Amino acid sequence: MKHELIMSGLLILGNPMMMHAQQTKTTTAESVSTESFSTDSNQAIRENLHQDSIQAIKENLHQDSIQAMKEKLRQDSILWEKQLEAVTIKGTRSQFRQKNGGIVARISGTSLEKEPTATEVLAKLPGMFKDKDGKPQAFIGGAPEIYINDRKVQDYSVVENLPVTQIKEVKVIHHPGAEYGNNVGCVLLITTKKNLQGLAIVENSGVLFDSFVSNNHDLDLTYTHGKMTYYGKLGYANWQGNWKEQDIATNYVSGNQAGDNATNYIASSTLDCKHSYYDRFYWSAGADLALTEKQTIGVKYDGYNIHQPMPFKMTSYAMTNDHVDDNVTGNNKFLYYDWQHHVNAFYQGYYGEKWKLNFFGDFVKLHTEQGQFVDEISEKNLANGVSEEEARNKFTLLPQSDGTIWGAKARANYTINDKQSLMFGGEYNYVKSESRADYTPADKGTSTHSITKEDHAAAFAEYSIDFKPFSLRVGLRYEHVDSRLKYLKDETGRTGIGRIGSSENENSETGTTGTGTIGTGTLQAISANTPIHRKYNNLYPSLLLSHQAGRFSQSLSYRSSETRPSFQELNTGTVYVNRYMRQIGNSKLEPSQRHDFQYQASYGDLFLQASYTYVKDYITSIITPDSDDPQTGYITWTNIDHCWNWGSFLGFRHRWGFYEPQVQTGIQQGFIKAISMGKEKGFHDPYYIFSLYNGFHLPKGWYLNLSFSYRSSGTYDFVTISSVHNFDFQLYKSFLKDKLSLSLNVNDIFNTKRHKTDGIYGNVRFQQQKWEDTRSVQLRLTYRFNQAKKQYRGENSAQEAVGRMGGK
């Protein structure tokens, strides 16, 4: 980072006015001499005259010198102001700086403020990139936990619709401390700009053109009067598109590999959706009150409603070696429906110069549905002489869940002295989730009904000390989890899981066999009907050692954490994927224990990150065949004894005149083993990422960006992912002193995004190809009147539980 101070006038070190004033005072005090009055004969008179004359002279000179000094000061002041007018300060200081174990990125007044959306801003921060869904993700650490003005973001659309010009700065924490939950690998703290009095309005609208036309609109109102701030938001988003997916599962039986006396059972399904759409309504309202200059309270309510039907045509076939056993066609539909209501309240107060207290409370009510409407017909059945109606497999499956969450959190910060501080607190969540899966007609499968209740309590503490150039942060987190799962009988009195399209099966206990197949009847190892009660009491230490020398900063951290299975992974309801594939949860999953080591360094605009992670009881998805029907497979989850991975990331961003490039590159390599085709096999092919953003600051405030992103092929768990790349174009312009902004984005210009996977677990090989319409043109218009910041500083204490229950 280079600093330049260029002055066309005289460069003066110090204040010349004060220098001259000091000289004037010295002259005034020492300019009167008494040597002319030193005659001996008139000593007494001289002494009297001497005293009087000195006093008079001093007074006269003092008055004159003061006037002269004032005039001189005035002239010097004028000269100094003229010199300052000629001063030009130029600098290209870095947009990023290390602070308290995190990286603070300036957004306001930088080129990042030109980005069209907050998502684009977050994806360009050190150590961040876009995932396959277009959301920001930490290359090391995964999906981030995001806060806006200390309030945890529960619905990502809040980030998507946050105007970039409202963002002041973002702090990136790649090694979260003891305060953050075990499921958090990265934290983004967004701080918005200072609040303005009066009414503030932000209207944000976007239109996206691909095979269809999609749009989104939201209106954000904030009113501040004195110590009170009221705000509300109302938004609607509609997305339309199409997609196509092909799934092929090959089950090798009676042999260790293809061609080695193995019988190959192949099942393939192609899902072709010509028109899928997504309607989302979202809203929020709240207020905060500054009780005093140091104490604030607030309350906020927010919610959403999502409706997403996806009709598709399905064509499937089943083969044994080279013989086609059956062809199945169908007109099916997925129907997703979700809603959520969330209330949050908070208190924040400062006490003296040393104490800061925060209290948060939450109540969440949410509902999710994943309806499936199946209407298929089998050529094999028709060939056997049955009627078309009898050959038709038609049913409805409705998995749904209702969740209730109560949460509370308290945190205290105490400043011991200017070098030491202490943070401690606790949190508690009560979770109740009721899940069921119902079939219509009832003889098409076995309905399930279960209730899960959890009590989750945690206490945490961190001690920080600064001994320049080093600083140390030591943390400890304690967690107690009491989880209870109970299966209920449905209306017919049945419990357990049956196969879709089959008659009800008895409750056998054959379980998962040594070959990885699912036994007849219920999946005992996956979904036993007996109640499950689990308790966990664990300690999780963390440590961060930082060092800073000028522009060079580095840190080394360690963190122990736990990843608990989501409610979807635990849910024993069966989800219909396609004619030959089902999905079912595993209620016996155990939490994964993680140990993360990370090194981080930055120098000016250069950022480096490296990590090593060891995971015990790693949770991963697998495919296992049905022993009665080797062409039918089940996607489920299981615990792997252990795995580990390492990764490294390098980023650089700098501006030279009108050109501002950003380069990001990284590598990830995982090491995991499994029995594959009868032999133990390691999966450890690395994959790389590379992205280049070319920003051009054009005349009259125009900003243009041409970008390229690439991800190589490599292994992720047991699956090999294909390489993918894309080119994007962006043009941005603001008007009316940034009150109005217009952005044009062309995504995936050459339509090159294609996703392919190929994986083997046990004796099953699974291949998938997925295509969706990713080439699009997006136009976004944002208008801001009296732009203001929401003062709400609440923090969602129930976010982890909401995420595990499938909430947004």
Segments (PLM) and residue ranges:
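Transmembrane beta-barrel wall of Gram-negative outer-membrane proteins
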Residues: 212-240, 261-312, 339-343, 350, ...
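Face-selective signature of the C-terminal outer-membrane beta-barrel domain
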Residues: 284-306, 332-492, 548-553, 606-610, ...
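Outer membrane beta-barrel strand-and-loop segments of large Gram-negative receptors
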Residues: 405-409, 458, 584-586, 590, ...
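Short strand-turn segments of transmembrane beta-barrel domains in outer membranes
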Residues: 108-111, 197-221
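Short acidic/polar hinge/loop motifs at secondary-structure boundaries
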Residues: 124, 149-176
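Short, acidic, small-residue-rich periplasmic hinge/interaction motif at the N-terminus
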Residues: 23-45, 50-57, 62-111, 131-133, ...
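Outer-membrane beta-barrel signature, preferentially recognizing the C-terminal barrel domain
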Residues: 448-454, 531-536, 562-616, 635-647, ...
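N-terminal periplasmic accessory domains that precede
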Residues: 86, 118-121, 137, 156-157, ...
